[in-house]
Amino acid sequence: MTDLFQNMFFLYGAQGPTAFSNGPTCVEVQGDWIVDAIATMQKTGKQTIEATKDAETSWHALVTELSDKTLFPGTDSWYMGANIPGKPREQLNFPGGFPRYEKECRGALDGWKGFVVA
């Protein structure tokens, strides 16, 4: 999800484990999270969900921190956005492993950490 876009869920997006994981498995976990989020919203009478800017910034910082512990930052690869002249170099995929990614996502459902839900 992205700040300023209420109820906009998207799969296989930037800073997910996309290129570093099995595609169908990734989409299944993300899809299950979306279904669970919507079901929880319905049960609690909520109609909108939006990621906070702070959550977006924190996620980017986590992805950067994890990436900085690898050799990725020193490579000229599309993983770092180096294939587009002038584009800022940053990690485009979650490099923390799929189990951690799933745990981070599931944790966000507990109390809607990082979201405004109304």
Where are the predicted features?
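FAD-site-proximal beta/loop scaffold in flavoenzymes
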Residues: 1-10
